[in-house]
């Protein structure tokens, strides 16, 4: 479990194909990683499979994760958002993030709003029920607040708007995203549980 507060930016050191999967080698500032530890990479929960004293670690990325996330597009030198898992003693400054990506959003625009930036993105239509104004969403693992959610577009997708404060912009890889790029999306897990419970108990057979 994570909180959506990015610890640091890492860099991709190597990408190796392993059948339909991949092994990512990331350079990071962590010096006390343990084998089997969970680290969120661009919001995707990955397991440390090896590491060294210089701060590099290897992660195995399954074919399912490659299809569902933007980790498939990573090349050597790319910046990635990193967050270590929370503990019971951790301050929950963001919101509960599982590291289970629901899909990818496409960046539509970035507009300056004083020192902040307003970012508009297009999301898959199936995620619309879980997105509400002033609700939480994780983009590339960053806990953010939805400022606006539209009713949907003709292509079956829908648009959302968020505001990035200067600190978030400068401390995450969202600063490196360009219009048309894809970012990982994880909607609020609480919204998914509520939707499932409502569907189970409010269908006509249970009404």
PLM region spans:
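Conserved loop->alpha-helix
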Residues: 1-207
């Amino acid at each position: 479990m994570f909180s959506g507060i990015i610890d640091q930016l890492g860099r991709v050191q190597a990408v190796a194909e392993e059948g339909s999967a991949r092994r990512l080698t990331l350079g990071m500032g962590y010096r006390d990683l343990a084998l089997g530890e969970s680290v969120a990479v661009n919001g995707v929960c990955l397991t440390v499979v090896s590491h060294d004293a210089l701060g590099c670690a290897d992660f195995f990325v399954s074919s399912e994760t490659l299809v569902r996330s933007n980790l498939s597009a990573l090349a050597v030198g790319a910046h990635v958002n990193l967050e270590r898992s929370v503990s019971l003693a951790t301050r929950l400054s963001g919101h509960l993030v599982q590291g289970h990506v629901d899909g990818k959003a496409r960046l539509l625009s970035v507009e300056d709003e004083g020192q902040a930036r307003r970012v508009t993105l297009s999301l898959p239509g199936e995620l619309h029920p879980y997105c509400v104004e002033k609700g939480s969403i994780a983009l590339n693992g960053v806990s953010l607040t939805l400022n606006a959610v539209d009713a949907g577009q003709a292509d079956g997708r829908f648009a959302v708007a968020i505001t990035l404060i200067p600190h978030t912009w400068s401390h995450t890889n969202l600063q490196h995203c360009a219009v048309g790029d894809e970012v990982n999306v994880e909607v609020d897990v609480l919204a998914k549980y509520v939707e499932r419970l409502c569907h189970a108990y409010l269908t006509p057979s249970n009404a």
